[in-house]
């Protein structure tokens, strides 16, 4: 093991003898009686294994017993990572820099001691298909690619219009060109190593960003493919549910439940399904679309990382 303080955790002194690891109250740990032993922290940069850390500390005048105590406290507090060198060496310098923050966040979120290596491996093997390349769909695809998902494919048969342009997705250069091709360009600018070709394989998850497409959801349910519904209209956006066929309610179930409360819902739903391309991202402004895309990406990544739907996040979560 080559111990390193988990990326993102900051070491600060509360007083001369108490070292605090992390600032967020949910993760912060205070280690008392540290004194000069705090110098051991500077040796935990991932370049040394346990024995080399002990040797370097000894050269600095720190006893073996003290080093072992510090390492034991940090390990017990879940503040150490051991990211395999092979994982880093397999990445290009640019990818390593881009993925580094993803690994740090994953390691903190899931409590892994491998520096996020397991999470990275799962994401790189994952395949997500995004249906719809409007402001929301293009944003979701770009975020997933940037977060390390190995294959992101976008299905959309339309051409890009001014209403599709967004800092989080398609740009001026994509106007009047196929939206799906525009998403490929978005991904290639961020993560050129991500696969974008649609060869018809079965995805690990599908994201539905176009409203009023019940037959699409039904097809995914029949195929047993997990899918996340995302909608934005009339200034309101909804992320979810994330449907796991055979394990959770499907979108059809929700429509039936709504029909019990509102007998006119089937008629309304049929009209929404026939609204055509003009209903895409209707009244979902740029900021809302970007927010929805980010929240959808959070849900997708949680599912890929753990096999379970994520939870809504907020500043106080």
Predicted segments with their positions:
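Adenine nucleotide-associated cytosolic modules
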Residues: 1-317
